[in-house]
Amino acid sequence: MAEQASSFTDRLAARFAGAQIAVALPRGEVTLEVAAADWHATCLALRDELGFEQLSDLCGVDYLGYGSDEWDTADVSSQGFSRGVEGKAVGRFAWGEFPSQESSAGAQPQQLPKQRFAVVAQLISYQHNQRLRVRCYAPDEQVPVVASLTDIWPGVNWFEREAFDLFGIVFDGHPDLRRILTDYGFVGHPFRKDFPLIGNVEVRYDEERKRVVYEPVTSVEPRVGVPRVIRDDARYETAAGEVGKSETAK
């Protein structure tokens, strides 16, 4: 599998000069990272020249707080579980506040991505029995915009709508870019890391009005039940090795 991945990455490097290519071993997963300006042209070439006739999935990613944890010790502690529900980390804040990039335990983000928002597409070539992950970062995190791929793979239509709905990523050229999972009057994008876990509004039935009403959240305390933990131990040796291989491949 390693030889097959190496041969494939050589072809990608020859065709897409300047792009970053990473290989995760031993599974042989290949990731092609391109600039947002080259997103559409690269995907078109992958379909027409390299035989990736199917896009099986597309999603958005929010890297806010990436690399930060909320529980950075493996030793027995007298502080107890309270450390998991105190402090200002990503997800632990109320509406109108901005999450801290630092954990309550003092851990710092590591290997931060270039930009906050990314779009990731999973491609399949049946004729070459090959899979490929393609990623690009939106250059503007205030209004993240990348080109739509609906004219290349029509089936990506609803995937892009989902990424727009949940992350607020705008797909330029999409024929019908509107929400697909949340209400049309929904405020914000719920998969963004700065979206409060308590939400913006809560729903209840009003006896006087005889209908459902939306009101600002007042009955929910902003807290995280399970803290984010990043551990380096034997269970993650393979993953750590893959990261090393990927960095070498770049």
From Swiss-Prot:
Protein name per the record: NADH-quinone oxidoreductase subunit C
Top EC category: translocase
UniProt function note: NDH-1 shuttles electrons from NADH, via FMN and iron-sulfur (Fe-S) centers, to quinones in the respiratory chain. The immediate electron acceptor for the enzyme in this species is believed to be ubiquinone. Couples the redox reaction to proton translocation (for every two electrons transferred, four hydrogen ions are translocated across the cytoplasmic membrane), and thus conserves the redox energy in a proton gradient.
UniProt-listed SUPFAM superfamilies: Nqo5-like
Subunit annotation: NDH-1 is composed of 14 different subunits. Subunits NuoB, C, D, E, F, and G constitute the peripheral sector of the complex.
The encoding gene: nuoC
Record-linked HAMAP family: NDH1_NuoC
EC number per UniProt: 7.1.1.-
A GO term for molecular function: quinone binding
Keyword Transmembrane attributed: no
Family stated for the protein in its record: Belongs to the complex I 30 kDa subunit family.
Subcellular location: Cell inner membrane
Disulfide pairings: none
UniProt entry keywords in alphabetical sequence: Cell inner membrane, Cell membrane, Membrane, NAD, Quinone, Translocase, Transport, Ubiquinone
Organism the protein comes from: Xanthomonas euvesicatoria pv. vesicatoria (strain 85-10)
